[in-house]
Amino acid sequence: METFLLKRWQIRNIIKNETVRNTDRFNVHFARMGEPTWNDNVLAFGIVLKEVVKSCGLIAKTVHPVVSTMLPRANRKLENFIQTWCGIKNDFYGGEAGLQFSINSTDDEQRRELFDNKSHSLATISEMASRLPMPKGRKYTLNFPVTAQTILDAKELSRLFDKEKFIVKITPIHETASAVENGFEVTGYSDYNVYRQFEQPLLEEGWDVIVFVPSKEEDADRITCGNALISEGRFNNY
């Protein structure tokens, strides 16, 4: 219950401190600062999110929640969570919600290194994916944050996943302190040509592909994935 109330407070705090009161789209991503599939409150909050947004005074034509998961193999309730979220996405939101799998590589050995051996194998993920219902609205997403070292085999991806269910999203490794310290290649990442080598083979295989090219301004403003902005002042009235 405390987590549920915290999520409600977070959304309310964001909206109340913005001057925008009308928007075409309000996105909420359950991701990155904690694996959402460990938290059943995410499912419950997905149901009440529209009402929370409305009660805060924001008029949004579309409220679009997204669950992004690295598919932890220690979570015995993982598939049940994902199937329940698919029901929320497809039925409650009429397709206007998202489910994203952080795949990151089509090579299991590289994935074990990237996820510290805490994610399911590609074979297991493929089996779970085959049992997902056909998506309404936007397809489910296979996410690949890419660097020069990323292994992304388009033919292997086609063997593992259904193109009718999934799209591929190619994103950057943002230029955070952690990324630099761990030796990820982030130079030139705001140049579209960096991603073309990954995109073209996927297109040739018949995949729908989204390429997200960031801007330096996003990292400078610390609004991207992997960044946390901590106030230097003291918190009051909390």
Language-model features: where?
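Alpha-helical scaffolding segments of alpha/beta enzyme cores, especially the outer helices
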Residues: N13, A44-E51, N80-G87, T124-M128, ...
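Short helix-capping and hinge/turn segments at secondary-structure transitions, especially at repeat
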Residues: K54, S105, S130-M134
